[in-house]
């Protein structure tokens, strides 16, 4: 048995909206019930600013357990100008937060903090071969609710848009700080300490000038990744 219902209301004075959703699953064949409640919101206090997210509670009940968990996601964005955009996000999913019965991927025992920055720089000098450059950086840090850190990751990208409509991209997907892969050892006390080694994935791409029929391009990449298992 499955049920899902949602209510949403606009709040003109706050330039936003909020909503509530209930999802319920009942599986008599295995005597299992699952409920998920979610309150979501999206507000724009000013033209360049936005604040949105959700808070959720899950409840699982069967012959072996009767537990509830809490999850939340908060995101704030601001466009400081036509050139600069910044985003910050915070996620919290406690140990007992379980939405797998709802048909989603299971994810819990996690606290994450992330950010995104984009800077667009148009080149006004018409003699320059570059018409515009864009720099993006996206970073994040994950930590289990027990305090295990999975490290700090950083993705950067620098793009060059040429006046002949060709395009050059430089990317780096890197691990700034190593940490424990606690997803692999979750809920297993005797599991080994699995450390995520430093990761560096570098990529260079060139796209030829765009035409109506075909656009050749070439990419070069170099990467390293891996794990190491030690006792805690």
Summary of predicted features, one role per range:
Residues 10-12, 23-27, 44-46, 56-58, ...:
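An acidic- and aromatic-residue-enriched active-site/binding cleft used to recognize and process polar
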Residues 34, 50, 54-232:
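Exposed, low-structure sequence patches enriched in small/polar residues
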Residues 40-42, 76-77:
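Conserved catalytic-core segments centered on acid/base and nucleophilic motifs
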Residues 1-32, 40:
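A conserved hydrophobic secondary-structure block that centers on an alpha-helix together
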Residues 9-14, 45, 160-164, 210:
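Short, solvent-exposed loop/edge-beta patches enriched in aromatic
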């Amino acid at each position: 048995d499955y049920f899902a219902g949602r209510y949403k209301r606009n709040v003109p004075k706050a330039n936003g909206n909020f909503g509530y959703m209930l999802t319920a699953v009942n599986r008599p064949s295995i005597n299992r019930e699952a409920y998920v409640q979610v309150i979501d919101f999206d507000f724009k206090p000013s033209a360049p600013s936005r604040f949105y997210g959700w808070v959720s509670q899950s409840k699982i009940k069967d012959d072996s357990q009767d537990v509830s968990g809490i999850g939340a996601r908060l995101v704030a964005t601001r466009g400081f100008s036509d050139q600069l955009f910044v985003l910050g996000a915070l996620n919290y999913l406690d140990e007992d937060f379980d939405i797998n019965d709802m048909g989603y991927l299971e994810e819990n025992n996690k606290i994450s903090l992330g950010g995104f920055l984009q800077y667009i720089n148009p080149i006004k000098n018409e003699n320059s071969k570059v018409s515009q450059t864009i720099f993006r950086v996206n970073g994040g840090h994950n930590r289990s609710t027990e305090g295990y850190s999975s490290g700090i990751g950083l993705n950067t990208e620098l793009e060059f848009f040429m006046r002949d409509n060709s395009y050059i991209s430089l990317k780096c997907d890197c691990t700034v700080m190593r940490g424990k892969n606690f997803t692999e050892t979750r809920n297993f006390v005797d599991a080994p300490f699995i450390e995520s080694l430093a990761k560096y994935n570098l990529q260079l791409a060139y796209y030829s000038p765009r035409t109506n029929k075909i656009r050749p391009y070439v990419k070069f990449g170099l990467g390293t990744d891996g794990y190491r298992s030690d006792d805690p």
